[in-house]
Amino acid sequence: MASTQKIRIRLKSYDHRLIDASAKQIVETAKRAGAQVKGPIPLPVKKEIYTVLISPHVNKDARDQYEMRTHKRIMDIIDPTDKTVDALMKLDLAAGVDVKIELQ
């Protein structure tokens, strides 16, 4: 059985518009270079809620809640060529997107 090589790209961001634009840019670049792309697959959103007392002494009922949502996407590039890897390395993505690349 022939083993195929693939690149797994994980994207994380607090802004869903930035992560979708970056994923679209990666997919277009990989397809233009001749690779097959699976994804972007949206992963569950991690929602962290912080509750803060806004009163310095009494009035425990006076609170504010803040939330932070972390959006995640994953995509696989199947059988990447050297041209594909070079094109992905030269790609300039938004500053608010965390990119992790694994070679499998």
From Swiss-Prot:
> Could you tell me the keywords of this UniProt record?
Ribonucleoprotein, Ribosomal protein
Q: Does the keyword section mention Plastid?
A: no
Q: Which residues form a coiled coil?
A: none
What InterPro entries does this protein's entry cite? Ribosomal_uS10 (IPR001848), Ribosomal_uS10_dom (IPR027486), Ribosomal_uS10_dom_sf (IPR036838)
Q: Pfam family of this protein, just one?
A: Ribosomal_S10
Q: Which NCBIfam families match?
A: PRK00596.1, rpsJ_bact
Q: Which organism is it from?
A: Dichelobacter nodosus (strain VCS1703A)
Can you say what this protein is called? Small ribosomal subunit protein uS10
GO terms of biological process kind: translation
The opening ranks of the lineage are: Bacteria, Pseudomonadati, Pseudomonadota, Gammaproteobacteria, Cardiobacteriales
Q: What does this protein do?
A: Involved in the binding of tRNA to the ribosomes.
The family database entries (PANTHER family) matched by this protein are listed as: 30S RIBOSOMAL PROTEIN S10 FAMILY MEMBER
Please provide one cellular component term from the Gene Ontology annotations of this protein: ribonucleoprotein complex
How the protein assembles, per its UniProt entry? Part of the 30S ribosomal subunit.
**Which Gene3D superfamilies does the record associate with it?**
Ribosomal protein S10 domain
Q: Which HAMAP family match?
A: Ribosomal_uS10 (MF_00508)
Signal sequence annotation: none
Cite a single GO MF annotation.
structural constituent of ribosome
Family to which the UniProt record says this protein belongs: Belongs to the universal ribosomal protein uS10 family.
